[in-house]
Amino acid sequence: MKKLTSLLMMSLTAGALLSGCGKNEPAPAAQSGAAPAPAPVASKIVIGLDDNFPPMGFRNEKNELVGFDIDLAKEAAKRLGLEVEFKPIDWSAKEAELNGKRVDALWNGLTITEERKQNIGFTAPYMENHQIIVVPANSTIKAKADLAGKVVGIQDGSSAVDAVQKDAVAGSFKELKKFGDNVTALMDLTTGRLDAVVLDEVVGRYYTSKKPGAYTVLDDHFGTEEYGVGTRKDDTALLGKLQKAMDEMKTDGSAARISSEWFGKNIIK
């Protein structure tokens, strides 16, 4: 009887031990410090531009986007292995377009200024520019001081606005009239609704060359400035890649070749 009782107790104890060993343990919790999935690699770059800014970026007779900056951007994108999309934007809202991530870069005669540097990352300058004064060929305006009492046209949101407003002569204008683009301002100059237009030299020289004898470019201007490519301040990776591509294009002569095709000479800085 004692043996039977002992055997029974041993059997119950072993069963309890086996039951305890077979208990399901909760699955270990996932480690909170796991590395996030890598961000997808970009295959395309979206360039924001003013599509009425010849010869930097504009539409030809076939409505195709062409221009000096267009060709530079295409060459840079090719070297980076990226598809390039050119997106016309309201140039006066360019910083909002860029920082709202609707475009990746601004590449269209973008002047480097200290104010813009607060919100935009810039490549090194690739071109020098002046804010020139264009008047009709028969105008009595011969110098900057002669703009007193005159109606002067300018592109809204352009660096010309800052350049003019910083000059004391601006206070003597009858009116500083702002336009959506330079071409429209020049058309108003032709029809007599403006006395003068202040605009980027590259645009003014290109436009006036198409209508010889119609305009005069004054010797006076509103200052010298430089063009750069702009990206978001925090997108240092893209900025570095664009700078590297531009440096290579300068070194191997590609930038000079593109410049010669548009301006007849190398004006790359």
Could you describe each region identified by the protein language model?
Residues 18-31:
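Bacterial lipoprotein signal-peptidase II cleavage site
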Residues 22-24, 70-79, 145, 151, ...:
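Extended ligand-binding regions for polar small-molecule ligands
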Residues 28-37, 135-152:
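Flexible hinge/capping segments at coil-to-helix
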Residues 32-109:
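Extracytoplasmic small-molecule ligand-binding "clamshell" domains
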Residues 51, 128-135, 183, 201, ...:
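Periplasmic-binding protein-like
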Residues 57-59, 73-82, 160-179, 208-212:
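Ligand-binding cleft/hinge of the Venus flytrap
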Residues 74, 78, 83-146, 216, ...:
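Acidic, polar ligand-binding/catalytic clefts
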Residues 110-118, 165-167, 188-191, 195-223:
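A ligand-binding cleft/hinge motif common to bilobed small-molecule-binding domains
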